[in-house]
Each structure stands twice: as C-alpha cells, then as structure tokens.
C-alpha cells in the first residue's frame, strides 16, 4: 500500500443525515479542494488554515452541493499530513458524487483505517492509540469510552514505554559486563538483577491482567437465554428489552433460530441472545436451531437457564448446568405467577437463581440487577477504576509473551547462564513490549489491525 499519495473517503456514517464529511489527506489535498471549491464570497482570498469557508463544490460546470470547506496544513493534523475536509449535506448520493469528484481530481479512494494508519506511520500516535480510535468508535458504554480514552491519551503506551526503558537499562549493563568483564558492575549482582527483572515482570503481568478485568466493558458480554421449550425464554427477552422482539406462542419450538439484541445494564453492555428450546426433535430446521443453541451456550459469558417454576429443573436443564458450570449460569425460575401457593423450586447447591414472571413483569427488575452482578462475577471483571488501563486481546497477548520471557530470563540468571545469552532473552522481552506500541510490529499484523477499521477513519 502506498503511503505518500493523497487519499479521500467519506468520514461520517453512511445513510441520510444533516451533515456528511469528505476527508482528504496527503500532499495534494489542497489542490484537490481548490479544483472543486467555488467560494460564495467575492472577498475570498484563498484558504486560511483551520478556517471554514462557505461555497459550492462543482465538478466541471456541474454544481454538486452547497458546502463548508476547511484546509489544515500538516504536520499538526490527525494524519500528520496536509488535510482538507468538505462538509456537505448528509445524503448518500451527495457524498458519493463529491467523493468521486475528489478522486477524478487527484485523490484515490482510501483503504480501511488508512487515515489512522498514516497517523501511526507519521508518528502522531503509537499503535495502542491507533487501536483506541476504533475502540472508541465501537465502545458499547460510557465505561468503555473512558477506557478507550485513556489509551487515546497515550497512557497505556507510556506505561509500556517506561517498562521497556527499564529493560533497556538492564540490556546496556549486560553489554558492559560482556564487553568489559574485568570491570565491576555492582548493579549486575545476581540479586539486584533478579529483583529488577521481577519488578518489571510484575508490572507487565499487572498490565496484561487489565484485559480480563475490563473485557466486558470494552467488548460487551454475551448473555444467552437457554432452556427447554416453552420455558418462557422469548417472553423473558421481550421483558428485558422492554419491547416485543421475539415471537411468543403456546406452541413448543416457536423459536428456531437465535435472536440477538444489545442491552445496556447500568453502563454494562451485553448482547442478549434468545435461543431455540433444548429438546430431541425430528424437525431438521429445529435440530439446527438446537445445535446453534448449544454452540452459543459454549461461547456465552453468562447463561440464563430459564425453567418453568411449576416444573423445576429437569434432566436436560441439569445436564446444561453441568456442562456450562455453575459459575457461568444464572438459573431463572419463570412463571412464578402460576405456582398458586406452591413452594418455590429449589436451586442446586452453588448455583445462583432468581424468580420472575415474565408475562406480568414481576421480578424483572431484580433479574436485571442479578444479570449485571453475575456477568461481572463470571468474567472476573469489576467496576472500572479511575486511571484503569485496558489492553485489548492483541496487546495482552504481547504482554503475556514479554512476561513469559522475563520469567525464563530469571531462571537463566539463577542457573548462571552467561550474560551474552541472557541478553538474547532480554532482547526478546523488549521486542514483545515494542509489539504492543507498534515499534516492531510486522506489516502483515498492521494490515490485519487496520483492516478492522471503517473506511474514512
């Protein structure tokens, strides 16, 4: 991919809206803008940097839209390059026409994430900040936004950089010990060396643990409604959503395919999935639905095992509970309004449970509270703290690699392995930390990261 030409893309969501923005970045961005822009004021004397100008975008003699346009010279721009923006009306036809005109006058269509990639390549941000751009856009909750903002501010990259600097200092001392063995290097005494290695390793481990603690706040959690047919799973989904989303009938097996909807529980974003009832069936379509239900249960952060309170837990439900594990299951006794004075069914030891009547809404508020607490417990998450750093899966994997290498290095030091060989391990740990911030990340990995971005970002 070329990185020194001029690119253009629609930077706002597609569809109809009041405003749509075309972003142009690269050495010819001002020339492209000048070729298309016709000012509305006779006093227009050229584009003043960072100033919006009113006018018309024309393609030849054909006026396309009434716009505001701005030019921002590099390097103090998002990409570090010269950047121009055209603020149009937000119709998809208008935006497509203006973008095509930009391409005809010297720009090319931007690839996914190419603006942010250029910002990274031009040193405007490290890779943790670049990834945080996409994480901020996709943040499912205010807490997720705060976690992404901390990375956008560079806090994760700074913490990783500080740990790597400590390893660099150790590497320098190793080099001195190897090159000048007759010199006394006091700080390279095995005890002091091991203490510093362990301190850095502990810092790396603590950073990596932030992924597990915050994953559900960053990505949301998958909560699956499962159970036998006619247990009231679809009614419960509708009650939780506060609207009729799933079809509800008295016929067993009404739900065959799974339905997934987003739900925000006091800042915790979940993906709520209603699944086909678990039973043996000769219907091929329903069989596939049951198979998909079992797959979703295996993937779920939390399973809401919905059972008819008038029947209690039956064999298939107990089997699901055994396979999923009680730590990932919240038993929901539904239809409590039909008990008519009978004793509430018991819950197996070690299981959490809640009682509701989805048809009337009784107990749903308590269920919402229970779901939120159960998700946090099942994922090992807690309420995000001020200054919490939340690496994503890729970053956590690189941190784990660094921690493993440092652990191996400590073993080498205890075994009196020569310093030059220890230096190889130290280089590996430094390289793993550099992967977090993108200083040594292969091009193929960068391609994969930025391919997940939207076009125009």
From Swiss-Prot:
Please name one Pfam family that this protein belongs to: TrmE_N
Q: Where does GTP bind?
A: 230-235, 249-255, 274-277
Q: Which GO terms describe its cellular component?
A: cytosol
Q: Which domain of life is it from?
A: Bacteria
Which residues are listed for (6S)-5-formyl-5,6,7,8-tetrahydrofolate binding in this entry?
Answer: 23, 85, 124, 457
Give the protein's recorded name. Answer: tRNA modification GTPase MnmE
Signal peptide residues on this chain, from the entry's feature table: none
Q: What does this protein do?
A: Exhibits a very high intrinsic GTPase hydrolysis rate. Involved in the addition of a carboxymethylaminomethyl (cmnm) group at the wobble position (U34) of certain tRNAs, forming tRNA-cmnm(5)s(2)U34.
The record describes its quaternary structure and partners as: Homodimer. Heterotetramer of two MnmE and two MnmG subunits.
Q: In the UniProt record, what gene is named as encoding this protein?
A: mnmE
Binding-site list for Mg(2+): 234, 255
The record, for CDD domains, names: trmE (cd04164), TrmE_N (cd14858)
Q: Which annotated residues bind K(+)?
A: 230, 249, 251, 254
Question: What Enzyme Commission number(s) appear in the record?
Answer: 3.6.-.-
Its needed co-factors are:
K(+)
Query: Matching PROSITE patterns, A to Z?
Result: G_TRME
Q: Which locations, inside or outside the cell, does it occupy?
A: Cytoplasm
Per UniProt, the keywords (alphabetical) are:
Cytoplasm, GTP-binding, Hydrolase, Magnesium, Metal-binding, Nucleotide-binding, Potassium, tRNA processing
Q: How is the cofactor bound?
A: Binds 1 potassium ion per subunit.
The family classification in the record reads: Belongs to the TRAFAC class TrmE-Era-EngA-EngB-Septin-like GTPase superfamily. TrmE GTPase family.
Q: Which GO terms describe its molecular function?
A: GTP binding; GTPase activity; metal ion binding
Organism from which the protein derives: Nitratidesulfovibrio vulgaris (strain ATCC 29579 / DSM 644 / CCUG 34227 / NCIMB 8303 / VKM B-1760 / Hildenborough)
Alphabetical list of HAMAP family matching this protein: GTPase_MnmE (MF_00379)
Domain spans labelled TrmE-type G: 220-376
Q: Which GO terms describe its biological process?
A: tRNA methylation; tRNA wobble uridine modification
Grouped into one coarse class, the protein's main location is cytoplasm
């Amino acid at each position: 991919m070329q990185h020194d030409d001029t690119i253009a893309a629609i930077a706002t969501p597609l569809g109809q809206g009041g405003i749509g923005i075309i972003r142009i970045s690269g050495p010819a961005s001002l020339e492209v803008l000048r070729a298309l822009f016709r000012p509305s004021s006779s006093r227009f004397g050229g584009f003043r940097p960072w100033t919006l100008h009113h006018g018309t975008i024309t393609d030849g003699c054909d006026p396309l839209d009434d716009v505001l346009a701005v030019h921002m010279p590099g390097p103090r721009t998002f990409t570090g390059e010269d950047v121009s923006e055209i603020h149009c009306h937000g119709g998809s036809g208008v935006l497509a026409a203006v973008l095509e005109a930009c391409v005809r006058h010297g720009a090319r269509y931007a690839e996914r994430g190419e603006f942010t990639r250029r910002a990274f390549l031009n040193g405007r941000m490290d890779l943790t900040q670049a990834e945080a751009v996409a994480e901020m856009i996709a943040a499912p909750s205010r807490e997720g936004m705060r976690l992404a903002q901390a990375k956008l501010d560079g806090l994760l990259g700074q913490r990783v950089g500080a740990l790597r600097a400590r390893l660099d200092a150790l590497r320098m001392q190793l080099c001195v010990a190897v090159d000048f063995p007759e010199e006394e290097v006091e700080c390279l005494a095995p005890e002091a060396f091991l203490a510093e290695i362990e301190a850095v390793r502990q810092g790396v481990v603590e950073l990596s643990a932030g992924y597990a603690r915050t994953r559900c706040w960053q990505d949301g959690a998958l909560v699956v409604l499962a159970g036998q047919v006619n247990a009231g799973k679809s009614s419960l989904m509708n009650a939780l959503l506060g609207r009729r989303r799933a079809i509800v009938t008295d016929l067993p097996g009404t739900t065959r395919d799974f339905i997934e909807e987003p739900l925000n529980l006091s800042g915790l974003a979940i993906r709520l999935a209603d699944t086909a009832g678990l039973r043996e069936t000769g219907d091929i379509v329903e069989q596939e639905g049951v198979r998909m239900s079992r797959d979703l249960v295996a993937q779920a952060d939390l399973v809401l095992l919905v059972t008819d309170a008038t029947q209690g837990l039956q064999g298939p439900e107990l089997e699901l509970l055994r396979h999923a594990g009680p730590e990932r299951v919240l038993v929901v006794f539904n239809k409590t309004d039909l008990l008519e004075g009978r004793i509430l069914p018991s819950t197996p030891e070690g299981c959490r449970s809640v009682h509701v009547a989805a048809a009337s809404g009784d107990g749903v508020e308590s269920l919402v509270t229970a779901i939120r607490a159960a998700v946090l417990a099942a994922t090992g998450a807690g309420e995000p703290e001020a200054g919490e750093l939340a690496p994503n899966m890729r970053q956590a994997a690189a941190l784990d690699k660094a921690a493993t290498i440092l652990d191996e290095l400590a073993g080498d030091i205890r075994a009196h392995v020569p310093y030059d060989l220890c230096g190889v391990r130290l280089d590996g740990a430094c390289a793993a930390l550099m992967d977090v911030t993108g200083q040594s990340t292969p091009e193929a990995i960068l391609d994969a990261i930025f391919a997940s971005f939207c076009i125009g970002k």
